[in-house]
Amino acid sequence: MFKTKLLPLLMALVLPLGLMANEKVIVSQWLSTGPLEINYPAFHETPNVEGQPFSNRQLLMFDHLDLNDYYPEAGKNLIWLDGASYPWRAETTDADGFVAAADHASDDKPQVAYLATYIRTDRWIKGQLEMRSPYLFEAWLNGKKIGTKSTMEGAAGENDADNHSGDDDEGNSGSDNSNIEDADDADDGELRGSYGRVGHDLELPRGKHLLIIKMMRPPEAESPWEMHASIAYDKSFTANDIQPEINPETTKDILHFMDGVQVTSVRPSPDGSMYAVSYRRSLPPTDRSETWTDIHRYTDDALVHSYRHASISRLTWLPDANAVSYTTALNGRTTVHMHDLETGKKEVLMENIEDFAGKRWSPDERHLIYTIREEGSGHDESMRHILGMQDRQAHFRHRSFLYRLDVETGVRTRLTHGNLTTSLHDISPDGRSLVFSQSRPDYLERPYYKHDLFIMDMETFETDTLLADKRWSVSTRFSPDGQYLLATGGPSAFGRIGENIPEGMIANNYDTQAYIFSLSDGTVKPITVDFDPTVASAHWHPADNNIYILAGDQDYRRLYRYDTRRENFDLIDTGLDFISNIQYASKARVAAYVGNEVNAPPRAYSIYLRRDSRDVLVDTSSERYRHVSFGEVADWTFEASTGKTIDGRYYLPPDFDPEQSYPVIVYQYGGTNPVGRTFGHRYPFNLWAGNGYIVYVLQPSGATGYGQEFSAAHVNNWGKTVADEIIEGTEKFLEAHPFADPDRVGVAGASYGGFMTMLLLTHTDLYATGISHAGISNIASYWGEGYWGYSYSAEATANKFPWNSREIYVDQSPLYRADHVNTPLLLLTGDSDTNVPPGESIQMYTALKLLGKPVELILVEGEDHHIVTYNRRLVWHDAIMAWWDKHLKDQPEWWEEQYPDFLSF
């Protein structure tokens, strides 16, 4: 079952120190700054309505600074009142382990000083932090308040409040370890044993953990302004596992890419003089997030307008003006707004529209084409008659239709009707015609849909059929002159004209191609048939009449230019490994995109397509990653015994030493997509490497981006050859890299990769452990039960069914080979997964349990195919890391702490 637990950095365990700890580490290295003068508020001696004067405790607990995302370092200045700067100084403790906070500078005003240290842990550890001082202080660890001491002892003054741990002032419970007494007290002698103490129980994963202590000294206090801190731990750990230091350099952790402001998209204005950038920010500790869009000028990056806190959506540029339109919603009804950014004028175009589902401007800005969704019937019936496989999905009975708003007059016109949804593709450059499609199920021929493409003259309402009864769908956009359509679809979209595979093979229609379709005579030119990369998106630019293709090129995602006159492709240097999205100015040779290098977080760029020069537009991550170090990422390919070249790459730890031996994680998907060079992937390879693992990522045959023949190997394979390629690749990688420990190799994958993980463990004992997320154990049950099982199988298992292909549905299903598994396997799945139902993991778990094989199953409550809820993703991530540590590092403590075996018998 899913374990409801937040980020397990800090746990409030009510355990006396003497029961858990055998050893301790003194925090001996500190950064300090101060003293900083503060003031009591006016009338602080006057009792409030509860009869209490303003106390030193209240002054201490007032947040003078925002310490979120603040990382002290020696020589860096802390900015105080009136812009005064105070440098952080490196300090060491005296022989008794005490550090001086600061030399007090005033006897008539209260003062604060700040101490900071970075606790480096080389593995997950459990222990207890103890802090001692004669003065008042508060402590934060990784940005969370962990304790407050509001007493003064000895010559410092009289006690005025109780000490406590945690955030009790905010209603959170914590263990009251303020007056810890243990067997060590007899030995404390020299450690000023009369000082009050604050303790807090810790659980720290591998990495750096920032401890900041704010100390307050009231006027005329006389005791030494000093602090003693130590971390106690039990015999499972060693002193080398816990090292306080003042260097903020660290490795990537899960919060680096879960938290902070992240840029999600950037869109240039029509003339390229402005750009709209969209952001997303998580709001921990909740599962909520906020999104917003800002408009900037290109020339000086000045903010033109911010829509933060405006609750808008669907923001788009008008085609020919520095103006945007967007929608707001109230009580289920939508209002469409327009905002002229040159004049500042705002106006409402349509108001209180029911069931609004989208909009698009005509290029001449005369019309707004919008979509209304009509709700289907019968979804709340207790006895529901299913009208085909798609009817299991909640939205299948809904229908969407097209409407037109005449912007000048405000007159609205309905454009389409019927029993099939009409999906808008594009509007012609002159604003007169639009292209739309309809789709309907056809269960007698794969891929079980038929598609029609239409063109409508919006002045006469005359509608012509461009394509009828097409088995494979296409997406289309008009050429700049309106004479052609740029179509994207699979190799079989227009028959065999787009296929480039040997005789006898079946094309992989997830390998998207680009075509030029003539509206005058219906002829089709397959422009990418000899182009190995797969098409992610395509744009026929009116500014230069060239086609720009964002393409999956092996494990990269790159930008290519197709010269429509010379009919050739050029690679454009974007400076990135993986572009997540790109948008183009409609009237200028300017584009803007978001992407990343393999070892650098995403940033937003602009590129001038005339000379292919680029500039950074938005960088929200560099400061957050300023102290994060990464290891090397290197390419590594091998020639399989089949003669195919199998591509791959591997990630090394930041402190890599070729003379050492490292555990290895092999990550594979094995399906139709390569594992791209993304940075914040759900399976973050550079984070795994930062935890002391070598991560080998390979791209077996069947992946797109390597040419159609390579991708077609996915069809009717289901691991027949791919499993051997992965095993062979692992063996050859280990042989070629002496620093990779062959006895400590794990394998992981998700979805199809989860299926491959299970299948691999039925074929070999090469791996020490495996992790399968949302994997398929029984191809037949996935085919019949998953929402898209049968339709995905239309490509992956073309013309093969459970009744005619035992060699796939039985022989390649891990469930039927479960008795061959000897390797510990972790099965993870969302308990609400509609793509690969959780039963796929449950079946394999049941089989392995009954066989007495080592297996664990975690169901993540309320999650679908991907784990996206903030706090659940953190716990899911920790489960993965704890499993790796247990089986590849012989460090079971983290896993056992998270998932103790209560039913061991």
Q: Model-derived features: where do they sit?
A:
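Accessory carbohydrate-binding/adhesion or oligomerization-edge regions at the termini
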Residues: G18, N22-F98, Y118, L210, ...
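Active-site-proximal cap/loop segments of hydrolase catalytic domains
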Residues: P684, G690, V697-F905
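Aromatic-lined ligand-binding clefts that engage carbohydrates, nucleic acids, or primary amines
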Residues: T121, K126-W140, L211
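A flexible loop/linker signature enriched in serine peptidases of the S9 family
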Residues: D259-V261, Y279-D294, Y307-I312, T327-H337, ...
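Non-catalytic accessory segments flanking enzyme active sites
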Residues: G260-R267, M274, S278-R280, P285, ...
